[in-house]
């Protein structure tokens, strides 16, 4: 969606919407759920996080400052 590309040519392409709030694509929402399981054994704490971002479909790339990829972690 954001035009980010990985590999030796890691970049945010022409459709990069960095620092432009008109379409709302530069916003990210973070939701975290904490689960505490108590019982006979030691306490176990489990964190489940779901991050939604416009660049989440770009294989780990997201647009950073000045339309650079931050980070570019494609696998």
Curated annotation (Swiss-Prot):
Cysteine-cysteine disulfides: none
Pfam families linked: Metallothio_2 (PF01439)
InterPro entries assigned: Metalthion_15p (IPR000347)
Signal peptide residues on this chain, from the entry's feature table: none
UniProt keywords, alphabetically: Metal-binding, Metal-thiolate cluster
The organism's place on the tree of life at top rank: Eukaryota
GO molecular function, one term: metal ion binding
Recorded family membership: Belongs to the metallothionein superfamily. Type 15 family.
Role this protein plays: Metallothioneins have a high content of cysteine residues that bind various heavy metals.
Name of protein: Metallothionein-like protein 1
